[in-house]
Amino acid sequence: DERFYKHKGVDVISLVRSVLNNVFTDTTQGASTIDMQVSKNLLTSNDKTMKRKIRDMYNAKQMNKIMTKDEILEAYLNNMYLGKDAYGAAKGAEVYFGKKVSELNLAECAMLAGMTNNPARYIDHGEAKKRQVIVLYKMHQLGYITDKEYRIAKADDTPFKSEID
């Protein structure tokens, strides 16, 4: 959600892009914001219905009226699903890397961030590594990390705990 701090719960640009893509191509593309995912994870359900999506949009707008963006992000990070029964960044750090969140490096954080897209797929380390590179590239492109941080994190093997044990 590259415009998380700029929108008020619903990213109109992503929504229009998603609708056009879904109407004019054979592929589907989502437009959920972090705010909408918090709604789905905590307030509604995983149903893939238009009714739920509209409810998530409404809830996201309401959350932005009563919560700061950092509070919404914290709710997301504490409840996101990462596969292997790991809900939240703290549990993900423990399950995948055997560490506390505060001990994770940039490469590990990017790998966890990438896993939220499709946890079942990214349980496989090779797939998780591919997704991690995409996350790091986007972070670099948006100016969240420097050239040096990008190169170092991209070069990190980032092994899962199960590969070390």
Question: What is the role of each PLM region?
Answer:
Residues 30, 34-165:
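Non-catalytic, structured segments within soluble enzyme domains
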Residues 1-34:
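Flexible, acidic/glycine-enriched loop-and-adjacent beta/alpha segments
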